[in-house]
């Protein structure tokens, strides 16, 4: 076993330990990983897309020797900001953004499944009824449920205009000004809730959320309860709002939780259940953007540097409490439940570079243990 010096930090009401090796820790990802997708089934973890391009990896955590192995490559346009769910032995990938054959970034509307037993990808004869990129997805009763994400026409239109304006700085400035200088409502982010039934290859309308759509939110689904946390209200402006919904017979009863990560909010944060408790960690934001927006400066992140949060929050008695910190600020990786804790796979750090780290958060009594 590798042993490293352990640093100790105190954050009432918990102790936080940051170490580098305990029994059960997982090896680093073979490549730096961000903006991708992941899932876990029967102790096997699958990750792909994002900075991995067409590569996908699997690690079997049931084995004594835990190592990442390549599986079948993604067969089509590489993409970011997609989602993946695992249902009945298949991984279903929805949406995302990638470059089309002309080299322009566009929203992807195809749906693919990966047969775990056959190590094979298949394009499905279906398309989501609403645009899905920067959305969230979770599994309920064998269906993949999705909400949130960018507006296809507005998003695709912006990147098409950026491509057309190349070489003309004045036109590029106008394209950016026209795109960013709008209030949040005018981005028409998706607040429809849709459900995909893979056994019938059909979509179902579950209505809309009672709050505006977001992009880059974090989602948890546990014991018929949905948690949608933070996210982006518009490009460069985060949300502090968090919501919970009780799902029963395809109906959702929503209620708002106290704000999290105030005053700026975060997007691309990591979230999961740890020992029956709701946790949110990391995420990215632009310090000062919320104040500028409230003063009517709709291009609220212009001239601001992106920051990466280290904070770990726990939902305690219907309120968010800071209970610790990650080793460094991280966002835009994958978080998964594992062995009663939360795995943080990859992410982006302050310099914008992707990382290969695998971090494990575990709560023991009144202690949060972080293993990197």
Curated annotation (Swiss-Prot):
Keyword Zinc: no
GO MF annotation terms: racemase and epimerase activity, acting on carbohydrates and derivatives
Disulfide bonds: none
Kelch repeats: 44-88, 90-141, 143-177, 178-223, 226-269, 291-340, 342-371
Compartments, as annotated in UniProt: Periplasm
Range of residues in the leader sequence: 1-25
Active-site residues, record numbering mapped to chain: 232 (proton acceptor)
Keyword check for Isomerase: yes
Catalytic activity from the UniProt record: N-acetyl-alpha-neuraminate = N-acetyl-beta-neuraminate
Top-level division of the source organism's lineage: Bacteria
Subunit structure, interactors included: Homodimer.
Function: Converts alpha-N-acetylneuranimic acid (Neu5Ac) to the beta-anomer, accelerating the equilibrium between the alpha- and beta-anomers. Probably facilitates sialidase-negative bacteria to compete successfully for limited amounts of extracellular Neu5Ac, which is likely taken up in the beta-anomer. In addition, the rapid removal of sialic acid from solution might be advantageous to the bacterium to damp down host responses.
Family recorded in the similarity comment: Belongs to the NanM family.
Listed name of the protein: N-acetylneuraminate epimerase 1
Organism: Escherichia coli O6:H1 (strain CFT073 / ATCC 700928 / UPEC)
